[in-house]
Amino acid sequence: MSWPVLAAVAAGGALGALARAGLLAATPQHPATADWGTVLVNVLGCALIGVLMETLTRRPNPHPLLRPFLGVGVLGGFTTFSAAITDATDAFAAHQPGEALLAIAANLIGALLAVSAAAGATATLLDRAAQRKKT
């Protein structure tokens, strides 16, 4: 991996982590329960990666640092599945197994649905825009 790519990932990761910290600070947190702000961050981040990847695959020559910066860096730093599992572990330890399992399911299923729906919606919008350009 080249130094410019590493720098792009590092800069993007810092921005993504700061955005996550800001969003998590703005969401209510309750002790001994799963952190639903983490679910929000992961689902939103996965939706954005769906938009990004669909957009980049349709560009003829995207800048070589765009995907490392935005995808791996910003969105990789924004999402946090390790924190989601830690939150679920904390909920289990607090004798809240239902909350823990619901949070795990919300993170995993929500993320899969978000990336799929966002990529599909982006593809539809880009196809419509391309059709309008032709007419």
Swiss-Prot record:
> Keyword Transmembrane helix: yes or no?
yes
Which superkingdom? Bacteria
Cellular component terms per the entry's GO annotation: plasma membrane
Q: Where are the transmembrane segments?
A: 5-25, 36-56, 68-88, 100-120
**How does the UniProt record describe the way this protein sits in the membrane?**
Multi-pass membrane protein
Q: Entry's InterPro entries?
A: FluC
GO BP, sorted A to Z? cellular detoxification of fluoride
Gene Ontology molecular functions = fluoride channel activity; metal ion binding
Q: How is its activity regulated?
A: Na(+) is not transported, but it plays an essential structural role and its presence is essential for fluoride channel function.
Q: Does the keyword Lipid biosynthesis apply?
A: no
Q: Where does Na(+) bind?
A: 76, 79
Tell me the keywords, alphabetical order: Cell membrane, Ion channel, Ion transport, Membrane, Metal-binding, Sodium, Transmembrane, Transmembrane helix, Transport
Q: Where in the cell is it found?
A: Cell membrane
The reaction(s) annotated as catalysed by this protein in its Swiss-Prot or TrEMBL entry are: fluoride(in) = fluoride(out)
- Function, please? Fluoride-specific ion channel. Important for reducing fluoride concentration in the cell, thus reducing its toxicity.
The record's comment on protein family reads: Belongs to the fluoride channel Fluc/FEX (TC 1.A.43) family.
> What protein name is recorded for this chain?
Fluoride-specific ion channel FluC 2
According to its UniProt entry, this protein's organism is Thermobifida fusca (strain YX)
User: Which gene underlies this protein?
Assistant: fluC2
